[in-house]
């Protein structure tokens, strides 16, 4: 454990040396990261297969491609983002230079998540490097194969002092959080997010928390249900439901509930065949603890599809629950598994009320052909982000910041927003020593009369 302090101190010394200040150095490190990924795609895929049973294609599409896109976008935009930003002048500052200067924060701690253990560890790192910080990486110990891989690869390609990787579980993370960082980025549960924030408060360290919650999916009667259900099924059951922005539950009018069930079932058959257990595209629950938690949420009396599982392989069949009571256990926590409850509401207003009576979610989804329905849902609810007539895809766009609100998190990242998150925007005014006559009015003694505006 004593080694953790020395690793963090070494990262701070490396940062204080000033070598991250030049943009060229940052670009070189991002290019090294890019090279690391491209030269080790097989190893990344193998680690993801070992932990989550992802195949080569889903590993690339769900995790790697987004990181490579982020690196490309960041390298192309960095010189513009880092330029001093002029601001409007007041009457008294017409002769001055006024601008905002972006400077690195210092040493950033990134605590990754187990469900997308490559993407959610490396993508935040991209923005932190671009902003000129040292970055201490703490991959999730739950996805142990990926943690092992990252701790091996990153020192081979990148500056060893600036970008150390620390492996371990709760004891190591607890020790890490005792250290003073200049920013902490955490992705994971709300419960642990509160622990991270409490630890950060002791050092007045700012945090970005990407948490989660129960992301609702409202399906309007005025909707192409074939398309809607295909997109919903894709987003819900990818990675076996272990996605922080997966649609957690469906809200719909009771008159279309059965039709939604049938169309979801058709999509599941199209995606995974008659038996999802045999599909190479269908994942597994990460460990026994999470497996037990998810199956405990399945009420057999409400099962319209699925509801079966295999404990040795941690397989849970894609499951649909109907006529779900809002007070039932499956509606009290983020499911984070392949179980889709359907709750019936009789109007858009009732759906909005239902959503607003609960904690603010990380994402919200609405399917409708009626723009007024979509605009009303957006205007009268709150969530980290919204996708209308699809799911999840808003987080793949680098020009849209990704983050939560309320219980689903704070702060945001992706694209330019990542650069801003990991930078201090420093207000600067540069004035000449000439023209002192114009400043005389501010000096004592005060005039007898107040000036008129």
From Swiss-Prot:
Provide the Gene Ontology terms for cellular component: cytoplasm; cytosol; endoplasmic reticulum; membrane; plasma membrane
Q: What is the effect of changing residue 154 to N?
A: In allele Ald3a1c
Q: Where in the cell is it found?
A: Cytoplasm
Q: Which cysteines are joined by disulfide bonds?
A: none
Q: Does the keyword NAD apply?
A: yes
Positions of modified residues (N-acetylserine): 2
Q: In which tissues is it expressed?
A: Constitutively expressed in cornea, stomach, skin, bladder and lungs. Lowest expression levels in lungs and bladder.
Q: Which GO terms describe its molecular function?
A: 3-chloroallyl aldehyde dehydrogenase activity; alcohol dehydrogenase (NADP+) activity; aldehyde dehydrogenase (NAD+) activity; benzaldehyde dehydrogenase (NAD+) activity; oxidoreductase activity, acting on the aldehyde or oxo group of donors, NAD or NADP as acceptor
Enzyme superclass (EC): oxidoreductase
Under Gene3D superfamilies, the record lists: Aldehyde Dehydrogenase, Chain A, domain 1, Aldehyde Dehydrogenase, Chain A, domain 2
Q: Which residues are annotated as active site?
A: 210, 244
Which residues are recorded as binding NAD(+)? Answer: 188-193
Which Enzyme Commission number(s) are listed? 1.2.1.5
Q: Which reaction does it catalyse?
A: an aldehyde + NAD(+) + H2O = a carboxylate + NADH + 2 H(+); octanal + NAD(+) + H2O = octanoate + NADH + 2 H(+)
* UniProt KW keywords: Acetylation, Cytoplasm, Lipid metabolism, NAD, NADP, Oxidoreductase
Q: What is its main location?
A: cytoplasm
Which GO biological-process labels does this protein carry?
aldehyde metabolic process; lipid metabolic process
- The answer, when asked if Cell membrane is one of the entry's keywords, is no
Q: Which InterPro entries does the entry link to?
A: Ald_DH/histidinol_DH, Ald_DH_C, Ald_DH_CS_CYS, Ald_DH_CS_GLU, Ald_DH_N, Aldehyde_DH_dom, Aldehyde_DH_NAD(P)
Which residues are annotated as modified residue N6-acetyllysine in the UniProt record?
178, 194
- Quaternary data: Homodimer.
The record describes the protein's role as: ALDHs play a major role in the detoxification of alcohol-derived acetaldehyde. They are involved in the metabolism of corticosteroids, biogenic amines, neurotransmitters, and lipid peroxidation. Oxidizes medium and long chain aldehydes into non-toxic fatty acids. Preferentially oxidizes aromatic aldehyde substrates. Comprises about 50 percent of corneal epithelial soluble proteins. May play a role in preventing corneal damage caused by ultraviolet light.
Q: Which family does it belong to?
A: Belongs to the aldehyde dehydrogenase family.
Q: What is this protein called?
A: Aldehyde dehydrogenase, dimeric NADP-preferring
The source organism is Mus musculus
Instruction: Write the lineage as a comma-separated list.
Output: Eukaryota, Metazoa, Chordata, Craniata, Vertebrata
Gene name, Swiss-Prot/TrEMBL: Aldh3a1
